[in-house]
């Protein structure tokens, strides 16, 4: 056993020389594990684990929105091992870290200085290696399970939006954000084969002539029958520009068909559109790398097809959980020509940003209405707040979710990732909507009747109570308002709810079809915005 004195010297040295003996250990590639592990045990790499923990601890201590000492998060991370074996407990007292297994002391190690990230990473690894000798559950847990337990512990006392994703989950997250190499289909499993239910536009699948109802039987000669969705997706996806050959059965044909295509960069569809009586209604489901481009394309095509008969735009953000901040900025910029869109403020220098509009308003000055509800969050709230504060849109619905924080993604050496809160969002009028949300000018909370008369009644009631609505909006947009009871009362003025019916869309159409009415509704927030200066 290594003595406490030697351990203390080792962890203190880590801040000066990196991981202890790392250059030598790299050459030997985990010498302690050269012998095969005992039956049931899993291989645990000291070098890899220390590297992963150091990267995670460093990212959290440097970038989290509030200061967090490395020692504090490391202790919480070690406590997280209890998720694998509840008999494992740890305490930190008198400069020592003590590990217990079922109440019995297993080891007592000297703690590094609180800010020594590398030292705490090395200590965490040594605690785990020692704990594996005392815990069958930990011996048989793979490294990913250990990482998950530790980082869940590390993040347990931070905000609810900071979280860890293992390598597999992180891969899926990156596909949602950044797209993936694929062919552009949606499918479900029917009779043990993938049945195509949708072909995405402008994708290899569309170009190759794939159609709804086709059943894929083979991909590059590999039978697909009986495979699960994950296995099928892993076969269909691959590096962009790589070739894939599909064999399929098509309704109405007896012989199998073979088609070949090259994979392309595929983005999940986030934009859908319909046009009713000259009003363009665009639903934005989330914000990924392709959202702003897709929205711009929809708006330009709508303008080309409608010409001067285009009356206005409804941007439906209900149920939109958010996504990429820069995409929300670009979406806002499509409808604004000047002024601030949003600012972000955090502890790390790179988290402080001021985003300004400089677009060309693809709605051409026509009325814009934004629909929000209690599930409109994050990037969706950025768009709603920017268009409302810049007097460009009337916001209709319920108070939004109130996720006014920004997360950065820390990619770890194991290909997992930590999503970490590192800044707060500040609306152009100066208020922070974290825990508060965006307040619609026309509130539909608790309204259940979808009739057209109900839409007119709500508009009439809001406009007749103009002073009350404006007083609420002035209080809502008070910069620096942190009093939780006041913020709660403000949210109660328009309770956050999930809205999926057509009432909000009917109100939007009423406003767009009556320019004078739209202007009166817009002035509800425009006047309160001016009152702040």
Which ranges hold each PLM region?
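PDZ/PDZ-like peptide-tail recognition elements
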Residues: 144, 149-151, 156-198
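Terminal targeting/pro-maturation regions of precursor/exported proteins
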Residues: 30-162, 471-533
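Conserved PDZ fold ligand-binding element
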Residues: 56-62, 131, 205-228, 314-316
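Bacterial N-terminal signal peptides that target proteins for export
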Residues: 4-20
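Short flexible coil/turn linkers enriched for glycine and charged/polar residues
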Residues: 177-181, 189-193, 210-211, 238-242, ...
């Amino acid at each position: 056993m290594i003595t406490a004195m030697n351990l203390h010297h080792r962890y203190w040295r880590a801040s000066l020389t990196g991981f202890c003996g790392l250059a030598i250990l790299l050459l030997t590639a985990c010498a302690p594990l050269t012998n095969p592990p005992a039956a049931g045990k899993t291989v645990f790499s000291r070098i890899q684990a220390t590297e992963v923990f150091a990267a995670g601890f460093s990212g959290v201590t440097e970038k989290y929105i509030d200061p967090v000492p490395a020692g504090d998060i490391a202790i919480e991370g070690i406590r997280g091992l209890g998720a694998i074996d509840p008999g494992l407990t740890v305490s930190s007292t008198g400069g020592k870290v003590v590990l217990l297994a079922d109440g019995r002391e297993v080891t007592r190690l000297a703690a590094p200085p609180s800010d020594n990230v590398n030292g705490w990473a090395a200590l965490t690894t040594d605690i785990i290696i020692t704990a594996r000798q005392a815990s069958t559950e930990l011996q048989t847990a793979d490294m990913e399970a250990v990482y998950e337990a530790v980082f869940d512990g590390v993040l347990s006392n931070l905000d609810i939006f900071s979280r860890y994703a293992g390598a597999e989950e992180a891969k899926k997250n990156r596909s949602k954000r950044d797209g993936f190499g694929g062919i552009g289909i949606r499918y479900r499993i029917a009779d043990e084969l993938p049945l195509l239910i949708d072909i995405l536009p402008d994708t290899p699948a569309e170009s190759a002539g794939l159609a709804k109802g086709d059943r894929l039987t083979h991909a590059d000669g590999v039978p697909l029958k009986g495979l699960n969705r994950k296995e099928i997706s892993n076969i269909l996806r691959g590096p962009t520009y790589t070739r894939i050959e599909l064999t399929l059965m098509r309704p109405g044909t007896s012989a199998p068909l073979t088609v070949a295509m090259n994979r392309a960069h595929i983005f999940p569809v986030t934009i859908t559109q319909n046009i009713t009586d000259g009003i363009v209604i665009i639903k934005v489901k989330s914000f990924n790398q392709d959202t702003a481009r897709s929205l711009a394309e929809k708006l330009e095509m709508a303008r080309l097809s409608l010409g001067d008969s285009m009356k206005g735009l409804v941007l439906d953000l209900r149920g939109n959980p958010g996504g990429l901040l820069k995409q929300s900025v670009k979406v806002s910029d499509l409808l604004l020509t000047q002024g601030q869109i949003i600012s972000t403020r955090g502890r790390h220098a790179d988290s402080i940003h001021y985003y300004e509009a400089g677009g060309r308003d693809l709605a051409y000055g026509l009325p814009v209405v934004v629909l929000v509800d209690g599930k409109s969050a994050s990037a969706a709230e950025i768009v709603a707040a920017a268009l409302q504060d810049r007097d460009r849109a009337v916001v209709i619905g319920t108070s939004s979710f109130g996720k006014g924080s920004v997360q950065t993604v820390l990619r770890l050496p194991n290909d997992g990732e930590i999503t970490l809160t590192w800044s707060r969002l500040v609306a152009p009028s100066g208020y922070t909507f974290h825990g508060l949300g965006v307040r619609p000018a026309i509130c539909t909370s608790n309204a259940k009747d979808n009739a057209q008369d109900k839409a007119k009644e709500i508009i009439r009631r809001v406009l007749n109570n103009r002073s009350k609505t404006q007083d609420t909006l002035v209080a809502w947009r008070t910069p620096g308002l942190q009093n939780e009871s006041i913020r709660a009362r403000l949210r109660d003025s328009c309770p956050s709810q999930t809205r999926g019916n057509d009432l909000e869309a009917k109100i939007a159409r009423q406003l767009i079809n009556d320019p004078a009415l739209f202007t009166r509704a817009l002035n509800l927030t425009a006047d309160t915005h001016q009152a702040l200066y």
